[in-house]
C-alpha cells in the first residue's frame, strides 16, 4: 500500500534544526532541539505546545525501513532550469550536500569622517571582499553554489565605520568531497582577508547534510514513468535540500 506523508519544517528557518518531520519519521528527532529558542525567545517546545502538538507522541512517529520498499518525493524545482527548457518534469540524480555556517567579522567601529582610509578596521569591506570570492569560487566549480544570504551590521550608522558584521554562509555541491573543498577554500579566504586587514572572525557550523544520490533502481522507474507519458528525459541534480535526504 501507499503511505502519503506531509512533513513539517524541513528548512530550519525558525530554529537551528532541519528536517524535523522526516527526522522524526526515521527516529532522528533530537530531544535537545526542543530547548532551542527563536528570535523572540520562544523555545521549540513552547511553539509546538502552542500549536496543539503532543511532544510525547514524537517517538511514536518512527517507521521501520524493513516495512517499506522505497520513498518517493515529488517537489517543484525551485529554480529556472525546467522553465527555460519548457519541460514539465525533471529526474533528480542527486540532492546536493550542504554546509551552513553563522559567521562574524570583528573590526573597530570608528568615525566615518575622521578615520583615514588607511587606518580603518572595516568589517563590512572585508565581508564585501569575501562575498566576491564566494561568488567566483562557486562559479568555477561545476554545479557548486555558495550564498551569503543573511548580512547584518549591528548598531550600524551612516557615519560609523562598521566594527562588526554578522553573516551566513550556505555552500552546496552534488558530492561531499566537492562541498567540503568549497567550504575549506571559503574559510581559508575568510582567514586570509581578515589577517590582511587586521581583523578577527568567528565561524560556527550550524548544519551539515550529506549529498544524497538517487537509488539507481528507483531512478530507472521514474525515467520509465516519464517516458511512458511521451515526455523527454532531463536528468539534473537538486540544488535544494529535501526530506528525501533523511
Where are these regions (language model features)?
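A structural signal for isolated positions on well-ordered beta-strands in alpha/beta enzyme cores
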Residues: 3-5, 202
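Metal-dependent amide/peptide-bond hydrolase catalytic core
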Residues: 102, 113, 124-246
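Short, flexible active-site-proximal loops enriched in glycine and acidic residues
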Residues: 2-3, 15
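Midchain, well-structured core segments that form catalytic/ion-binding scaffolds
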Residues: 9-10, 14-16, 20-176
